[in-house]
Structure formats: C-alpha cells, structure tokens
UniProtKB/Swiss-Prot annotation:
Avian ovomucoid consists of three homologous, tandem Kazal family inhibitory domains. GO terms for cellular component: extracellular region. Disulfide bonds join C6-C36, C14-C33, C22-C54. It comes from Haliaeetus albicilla (White-tailed sea-eagle). The keyword NAD does not apply. Keywords: Disulfide bond, Glycoprotein, Protease inhibitor, Repeat, Secreted, Serine protease inhibitor. It is found in: Secreted. GO terms for molecular function: serine-type endopeptidase inhibitor activity. Glycans are attached at N43. PROSITE patterns: KAZAL_1, KAZAL_2. This is Ovomucoid.
C-alpha cells in the first residue's frame, strides 16, 4: 500500500508543481498538496491509488 503523509495539510494555497497522483476516486490530482487537501476534505475516505495519472 502506498501512503502519502498528509499531516501538514490542508494548505490554503498549493504550488503549481506537477507530480500527478491518482486518488481512490479515480481522479488525477496535480500534486501532493492538491491530493492532501482533497483527503482532508473527504474526512480521510480518499486514499492514494497510485503515483502518476489515473
């Protein structure tokens, strides 16, 4: 299982860095910050499927 540490999130602004991650919702997030903000918004129900585009 691949895990991303989202303990420092949410953040108000994410960088434009592009390092895509695929969430368990089959959505591609542009970077860890975008993904972790979504994880926080989902109350932890969203998980990482894999690194890279979905």
């Amino acid at each position: 299982i691949t895990i991303v540490d989202c303990s420092d999130y949410p953040k108000p602004v994410c960088s434009l860095e592009y390092m895509p991650l695929c969430g368990s919702d089959s959505k591609t997030y542009s970077n860890k910050c975008d993904f972790c903000n979504a994880v926080v918004d989902s109350n932890g129900t969203l998980t990482l499927s894999h690194f890279g585009k979905c």
